[in-house]
Amino acid sequence: MFLVIGGLSMMSHHYTLGNIKSRTVGDGQHGTARWSTDKEIKQTYAHVPFKVREWRSGQNLPTEQGLILGCKGKTQELTALVDSDDIHCLMIGASGIGKTAFFLYPNLEYACASGMSWLALDSKGDLARNYGTIAKNCYGYNVSVIDLRNPTRSDGNNLLTLVNRYMDITRKDPKNLAARAKAEKYAKILAKTIVNPDGDDSNRGQNAFFYDAAEGLLTSVILMLAEFLPPDEEHPQERRHIVSVFKLVQDLLEPSKVKGKSHFQLLMGKLPPDHKARWFAGAALNSAEQAMASVMSTVLSRLNAFLDSELEQVLCFDSAIDAEKFASEKSAIFLILPEEDTTKNFMAGLMIQNLSRELFAVADENGGKLQNRVVLYCDEFGTMPPFDVLPLFSAGRSRRLTLVPIIQSLAQLEKNYGREGSEIIQDNCQDTIFGGFAPNSQTAEVLSKALGNRTVLSGSVSRGKNDPSQSLQMMERPLLTPDELKSIPKGNFIVQKTGQHPMRTRLRLFLEWGITFEEPYIVPERVDRAVAYANREDLERNLPQSSKAENADMRGAYAVSGRGGIAHEPVDKPRRRGGKQMKTYGEEDL
């Protein structure tokens, strides 16, 4: 009897809720989510010993180009987990989780060691200050700092650099059609980027004509500026920049002394009939006077954002690194954005958009891929104004261009790009790394759901007087609940990769990687740089002189000066025929 009672007592104590563990059971009836195994991690990610001292001395440089998404090993003896596939990577983390110290610094070091060209958005200036010297002195990089916070301490970033370069080649060799075609291509890319920064043509509606015509007109003015106003003995300083484009459009919009003709119409009439600048402006040139004025006003409104005395120190001087140099040589660009002045944030989107489109053009000339992998580290991507970034995601990956947008919340993407745009960006990121969320974060709930569910053991225990019982069943459980995501320790992250199970990983503080900083990289003060502007009069004087037959055939009514420019006053001595005074072209309209 005592044995029976003891046995029942033991059974009653054995059936406890604490003994029911949420271990994976069944055959995936409620979900099959799980973590990657060590074997799968080894097969998916390249394991590269992180040897900073050797790399900086030029020894044992890594050959695998890619992104560091984790590490293994002890301090100072770490092995980096590198994803070397053609990918985009979305990083999500709240402020203060160490996105720069744990993620960016190791990746910048590895990018330099593996020879990738890269651009880094830098909201505080720390990246440029700490890594400019290392990239230049230790790894032999071309370094450019575009500082929108202190433009007088910035390198130049002339948006017309490539247009000017190929137009100079064309001017020296008029038969070089390839150079002229490249100049026209880069001019069209820049015009489209400025007139249509968000890339959404669907919202134009009935105004589509004005925007399309504005793109053509802007392309036309850029080409004329690049071709006919190069530096010369009288004007040795470069005048071909975006601010001069604004000034020319404004001057050409003014009415001339020829009734019913603007300076723009007279200027276009002076060009040879087969000149491409005349063709690009055809939509505006052949429209009604009021419509043409609206087109030119649209161009001015788009260019108005560049009118800033400080920004001129950046925009009006030649770029230290252009797209072709960026793609073919080891180059690093630091784009410093002022957190306290969001009015200049549009420049970041414009520069990234224009650079990426130029890189696409370079890749297309090299068999559809860039010679060297290019990475754009877009820190604070969520605080930037929206721009036409979707083609960069969809077309950049196959061309060896990797984008790394770093955001604080998925809500930032939805706010800037809408629900559909946010989903497109997320779907085009083959890697997602996240960790460290605010207590009330909704992003943690979304990502918990994205990790999926697994089938776990569940059950209940009931105790009667003489018959304790236990019931077991299967149920679903998130791989990580939102609460568990919010409590992830600093430096720990979750990595999701397309076609793979998620990975729990750890990124160490940059000091534990063996990363040390050298002397700060400082761009010298350039407060004494005077800006030179183009003007309509010089442009008219430098236009090619047309033949008499061309002058007689021109539809625009005006007289032609002996130097090839446009004479807006009637000629001094009107011709007479048969005793009757002949009118000069355009005089009948006065």
Label every model-predicted segment:
Residues 2-8, 443-450, 500-503:
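Short intrinsically disordered, low-complexity coil segments enriched in acidic
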Residues 46, 56, 346, 380-383, ...:
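A short glycine-/small-residue-rich loop at the edge of a beta-strand within enzyme catalytic domains
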Residues 1-97, 101-109, 114, 152, ...:
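Basic- and hydrophobic-enriched, low-structure N-terminal and domain-boundary segments
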Residues 508:
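Short, surface-exposed polybasic-aromatic patches that bind anionic ligands, especially phosphate groups
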